[in-house]
Amino acid sequence: MSDNSKTRVVVGMSGGVDSSVTALLLKEQGYDVIGIFMKNWDDTDEFGVCTATEDYKDVAAVADQIGIPYYSVNFEKEYWDRVFEYFLAEYRAGRTPNPDVMCNKEIKFKAFLDYALTLGADYVATGHYAQVKRDQDGLVHMLRGKDNNKDQTYFLSQLSQEQLQKTMFPLGHLEKPEVRSIAERAGLATAKKKDSTGICFIGEKNFKEFLSQYLPAQPGRMMTLEGRDMGQHAGLMYYTIGQRGGLGIGGQHGGDNEPWFVVGKDLSQNILYVGQGFYHDNLMSTSLDASQVHFTKEMPEEFTMECTAKFRYRQPDSKVTVHVKGDKAEVIFAEPQRAITPGQAVVFYDGEECLGGGLIDNAYRDGKVCQYV
């Protein structure tokens, strides 16, 4: 057995099964493991139970079982300043943000990594489904997780080479059922715990109610592109491009009984545009532009590449041509794409490798900007 005992790995433990098994595997491989619970949000639920307290109890139980020290660290201020303020600003601007991308970039692999280094960490590890491979030049490449259904490189696309150099993803070569069975075989306290879903700071709460606590809703008119008034919308921030449910229109108003979708927004007029048909013309675009474009390794200031891309999590890859200039990019699609949503991440791949990504600013149809914000 290689002597890993001199290598300290600090594991981000959430109280879930994935991070529990991450800590277990590293401990079994002989590393000097420390578990850290990050408290990023003050989240008392409607029954007055702080879910973070429950999760921390699970971290403590698992850490005791596998015999590692554990601590809790509070990143509520950093999370509020670097993730939540961004989340609200994006909604104010009529966009649909992806807080998980920002949380990984700013908290899990920045604030947490910085903290871990003060504990003498050689590496940090998380329960993400992704893989890191080091080439002969010492460059770290981020590859998709083996479990295609769970691959999380989309959310990790803003990580830098410096961050990846210090990162381990022990679950990357496993599929989710294998992770559960490892937890069950080891009798871990979290083996049967269900996966958390949704945005971390909202949890099981109603999204509309949550958002309205921070941003006052501004109801307005719901219109077709032809100018027909379809009623009132509850506030542009509650709707995302391509959304079907929650419009309150049903099959009415249309002669062909096709379902209705959100096909555009006009922030200045506070109008929500709706139209019939999954592939409504206004939902289809041929290119996008992105900002905050970033790659996992150093790239030229200006270049063009052919690769594949994802425009949302768990979507099949699409072929694209990317023209990069500084931290901006124009992405041209080989085939028209549906519901490209400003605020979401566009992530680039070369085969199994995640190259990086950016945040979508606008979608275009044959050179003309789509009215999505």
UniProtKB/Swiss-Prot annotation:
EC number: 2.8.1.13
Family annotation (SUPFAM superfamilies): Adenine nucleotide alpha hydrolases-like
InterPro entries on file: MnmA-like (IPR004506), MnmA-like_C (IPR046885), MnmA-like_central (IPR046884), MnmA-like_central_sf (IPR023382), Rossmann-like_a/b/a_fold (IPR014729)
Catalysis performed (reactions): S-sulfanyl-L-cysteinyl-[protein] + uridine(34) in tRNA + AH2 + ATP = 2-thiouridine(34) in tRNA + L-cysteinyl-[protein] + A + AMP + diphosphate + H(+)
Region (Interaction with tRNA), start-end ranges: 150-152, 312-313
Chain segments annotated as transmembrane: none
GO molecular function terms listed in the Swiss-Prot or TrEMBL record: ATP binding; tRNA binding; tRNA-uridine 2-sulfurtransferase activity
GO CC entries: cytoplasm
One Gene Ontology biological process: tRNA wobble position uridine thiolation
Annotated family: Belongs to the MnmA/TRMU family.
HAMAP family on file: tRNA_thiouridyl_MnmA
Functional note: Catalyzes the 2-thiolation of uridine at the wobble position (U34) of tRNA, leading to the formation of s(2)U34.
Name of this chain's protein: tRNA-specific 2-thiouridylase MnmA
Protein source organism: Streptococcus gordonii (strain Challis / ATCC 35105 / BCRC 15272 / CH1 / DL1 / V288)
